Amino acid sequence: MATFLERYQAGDHLAVWDELMALGEGVRSEHCYADALAVAAETMRRARHNVELLIQRLDAKGYRFRDRVSSAEEKISRLDVMDQMSAQFETMAKRTPTSYNIHSMKMLETMQAMKAKVAPLLEKVAANAAKEAAAKRKPPLEDPYVFSPPDAETPGLLERLEKAAGGPVPLSLRAWYEQVGGVSLMGSDPALNPVDFSNRNVLQQFQSLVKGAVPIPSPGEECAPDPLVIYPLDALMEDLLDEDSEESDDGDELQLVISPDDLHKANISGDAYYITLPDAGADFKFDDWHKDRFVNYLRKVFQWGGFPGWARSKNPPGKELAELSEGLLPL
């Protein structure tokens, strides 16, 4: 009788993962654990191949990744926007009718006091951001903001994660971090991901608010492309430390952020995608808008060239997405 791995390698991808999930915690039984783990590892080896190919193809298209340099430029832009908003608020406060002026001035004083208090920190942030923005841009596969593959610390971090969670992580998640690591396809491109990370939109919305106007969404804003982002394992551990410092109402369950959600990725105030641990199953529910299992989520990611949010659009950039997804390995 063929093993799960042999069947998976022969192309029976969907059925194998369905059967592994149907086993529940039994997937960790002595007679099938090694086989199931091998399937998870093979799946994520394919995922890594696809991730690296997508990054290379996006780079060749001139995609502007949200890498170390552009992230630093974004910080500088955000600080500049804060200064402009503060100045505009001061002007607004002075022009406010007398009956409201007292409240406006109090708000302004509070804002200025907070700004003065954090000024040294902001100066340090600005200096570090300027230094990083001036640095030479690395190829995206070498930039940890885009791709951070597993290293010698990965096994120890996984062990610490399971110890903190009080139980195992799903086989698919373990294999992801052992084979792939952290990935972020966040960035901007006129067709694939028309997102402005300069924070100019924040200033424009503030200006509209000051003028009493309501911003009108631009065409196409109804669809967030939702590029693939899975936080590095060390970022999950930082989130875990934050969890430890707060009291949880979930009993023994531990909820960690694994990725920003589609709106957050689009530079709109959003939330995140979470994972709940411990989980002894083969795979886990990926808490995005699909509400599907992680492996199925990855299948959709690669089907849509790294941008599964376009599945909701009536007019996706079909040519570009087809070029990105061509020849990717099936999971």
Locations of regions flagged by a protein language model:
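Short hydrophobic alpha-helical segments that form membrane-spanning helices or hydrophobic packing faces
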Residues: P170-V180
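A C-terminal-region feature
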Residues: M1-E159, E178-L331
